[in-house]
Amino acid sequence: MYAAMAERLNAAPCCENLYSKKIMDTNTLGKITELEVMSYITKKGYSVSIPFGDKDRYDQIWDINGKLLKIQIKTSHLYTKNTGKAIEFKTTGTSNGRTTSYTKNDIDYFATFWEGQVYVVPVEETSSKKVLRFEATTNHPNICWAKNYTVEEVLGI
């Protein structure tokens, strides 16, 4: 499966993302993020299920010690403001051409993958985007430090 994905990576058409950096098409990039997250959680010994079809608001269901969690996977991008190293991901979806927010009824967590680590954020802690910081130029009390959102820290796995 990964060999086929690697072939697609090399042949994938590029497009411009929101930050004007060249990337492959967003659908392929999203699928890669989903695979990275699934692989990470599975390697930790937990089950991951994928819903059939496109009607569900979540991408994966994780079975963490008998508790089923609805997970929406989002691709992160390097946050480009001059505020120290951070990643950002959108916490909205698109349905019928309209931007929609997620609620606790839709999902339990957002998950993203960055530099070998899965980060999870409870849906109730988000608005239209989430920024997780690795370093900052100022020490503001509202900074969301990435280390506090690792899957290990949040879910205790």
Regions found by a protein language model. Give the residues of each.
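Mixed-charge (Asp/Glu-Lys/Arg
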Residues: M1-D56, W62-I157
